[in-house]
Amino acid sequence: MKQSNNEPQRRPLNRREFMAAASAAAISLAVEGVAQTGGSGPRKVFLVPNFHPASCGWLTTFSRERVYCANSYLDHLDRVRDDPHYAFVLSEVNNIIAIMNFQPERIPELKQRVAEKRVELVNAYFLESTINLSGGEALVRLGVEGLRWYEQVFGLRPKYSWNIDVCGTHDQMPQIASGLGLEALIYTRRNPTGKTIYWSVSPDGSKILTLSPGGYSEAGAIFSSKTLLDGDALSKLAKFFDSKESITPEGAPILVLAGGDDYALAPTVKSYPSEFLEQWGKGASGRKIEFATLSQYVDAIQPEIAAGKIALPTLNGGTAYDFDAFWIECAEVKTRYRRNEHALQAAEMLATIASLRATESSFDYPAQALHDAWILMCLNMDRNTLWGSAGGMVFVSEQSWDAQDRFDWVKKTTEQTLDSAGKSLLPAGTEIGLFNPLNWKRKDPIELQLPAGTSLEGLPSELLPNGSILCQPEMLSISTCGLKLAHRPASTPEVVDLPEVIETRYYLAHFDRATGALTSLKSKKTSRELLGAPANVIVAEQPTKVQDNAPADFMPPRPERTRVASSSDQPSTMRAARGPVAWTIEASGTFYGGGAIHRRVRLYHDSPRIDFETELNDVPNHTVVVAEFPLALDIAQVRRGIPFGFSHGAWATPDAQLHGWTKGIVPVVRWSDYAFSGGGGFAILDRGLSGREVNGRTPILYLINAQDEYHGYPNGWLSGKGRHVLPYSVVSYDGGWSEARIPQMAWEYNREPVVIPGRGATQAQSFVETSDNVIVEAMRREGNHIELRLVECRGLPGNATIKVLFPHQNAMLTDLVGRRLFNVRPAATYRLPVRAQQIVTMHLETSTSVPILPATTSWESFVPAEKVAALHAYDPELKGHPPFGNGATF
């Protein structure tokens, strides 16, 4: 219709006005018919922008990754400067160190924005780690070191367990996070409750507010669009917010962790978020949006929760897992980490004792070196590093500081500390000293490196092919001793014909002479058969369906894979040898792909542990290899080690009182256990082979997920090429699980006594003794006290005793960061009530102090000289997502 002259003349809309009008109409249409919450209209949305990298390297080196991270966070900081409506959260100490190193002039600005509450230092931990693969003490140190760093550098303590990229959350996280004094636990995957806010509860009863709102980088159109959002895009955004209504507890606003996918930058449209909010405000939805920090959201819900106006569900136990390839691959990084963390904990213990009880020479507690070692272990807990899921340049690089460098630095530090501390405690001589870092009397089989041609006086011992000595010395709890050497070699095991039955104090075992499989294992005590089919059969498998996703990230469970070969397909050459300590059975043959396979099984005359070592060579690409142990009896319950405890779930028959997750591929720390319906059970121990799965009566241990490349980059540690030596162990028991001492046996398998050469023969001396229901994970010096940390290990409430046999004054129980809970009267023996899997921290005052250490703000002192140039290389244009590879070496 032609416009009437009487109608007012309207000027044409410019583009932004047109977009705003269209947006308003779209939002209005989108909310028609949407249910109103409590009759008050749609709930407010808190958008929390964040940047999510793999800060120690994923698709590039450590040195280059930190440039990406620094520049990307500065991109967010620029938007805070330029737009009064923008806010974001910043995570990981090493990212701030990168900003300090490359653009130190921006640090005052960052501190200003933190004070203005437009930037929040959100993560209490030193970095965003995988929480499922380290020991408990390493995970706690990650939090302690992070909190101390922020307090020293920024004068504040972050309030959150920011775990947005973990791939499953274990049962002890509520206790660890609350023990660190944190207000809430945040993760995004495998939320089983159906609500975005709930209480998470650990086995000891500790609970923490938990936020699991969806993905960690949602509402992506706001950030990734190159133009103002049009009506259709805004309509989709409105529907996305609507979808959050049903999963957000009634009465609570909506939380969205916002960004444009991994490595998210500030919105590409420079006028966002202000212009976006203007667009949104002209719509008719009535839904308010605020770009906020996490604390602004938590501050909004906490009073309402406390007043009972927001009802929350409760989750006991952990969650399911995903990205399951992470638990089964790159044994090199996982075993190195395990070895180093146990060595570091032992070094702290012996150094503590030596600094207080040295008799041969004075010993100063090496506080700086041990602190530095923990900082480097924190870096190697970075998610993609410890998962083993990254380009090879993250692990070994000729140009850049890498994970191997950090492992080597920690190894050197712990060896030097153990040697010097041990020598200050024990008199010089021509014998050897031993230090047992475990808090119980032990007599497990161990391998010792002794001077050539010697053995231990008065103790059965046998010579191993690698030149070490196999023996079983008895040692007291957390003790030192000096043992006399016999100047004659240990016995060489006698090669014999493989007997029909191998008999030890604990087992009757039979091996297949053709395949090398363990075909029968009977309890000596009950004559009960433990195996339902040949065991320690090594099986090669591949996914049944062609995978679209990267197999170094995703791996289906065993029922969705095809068996392509096994160690029983080809004949094996068998060898049996009997020594004074053990039977050793070896089977050699050819495996899938044509590579050699060597299996060694060691059955000890006087130990229930059976040790295995499987060597694989040149495993073909895209192949999963497992060791299977089919059992003869139904499995009633499954337990598996997690940081500072264990997960406990039902198997054959559901049990609502057991909350542990048991299905599919799961991560394990040190041990998994399968309790039989009729009593007794079977456990698998590991030194870093962290993947387990059980189907029916058959547990499997994952050995290799062979992938030559990771997203286009070669990775020698992930590849099946070359030689792979993979140790593991099993043990069975006839009685109840709480008496079987499986956690203690797993610690023994992972931490042999420390050898101190060139010492005199001395009586054994114990320094800490405890009841058998706790495991001491840490003993170190800090300031004017000794920190002693232990955990109840049976899963049962009771009483613990701790006898401390070195001088100290006042004592108190603290939380994980050393804040006093209550004083304890000083005594030689402490008796404490403990809850199931409770973590207990004691501080024992000393008459002398060790220095309080400054915060780490540079990596140069740790980096090999030839790699310092790469550490300092800076390119201001690098930000956002590093590129994927093309099959070439980085």
Ranges and model annotations:
Residues 4-25:
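N-terminal secretory signal peptides and thylakoid transit peptides that target proteins
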Residues 33-37:
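Boundary at the C-terminal end of the N-terminal hydrophobic targeting segment
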Residues 38-141, 150:
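N-terminal catalytic cores of secreted or lumenal carbohydrate-active enzymes
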Residues 47, 52-58, 152, 208, ...:
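Catalytic grooves of carbohydrate-active enzymes
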Residues 75, 102-113, 192-200, 230-244:
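Alpha-helical scaffolding within the catalytic cores
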Residues 107-121, 178-193, 203-206:
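Acidic, His- and aromatic-enriched active-site or binding-groove loops in soluble protein domains
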Residues 139-172, 176-179, 236-258:
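CE4/NodB-like, metal-dependent polysaccharide N-deacetylase domain
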Residues 173-176, 212, 224-233, 241, ...:
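C-terminal (or distal) subdomains of carbohydrate-active enzymes
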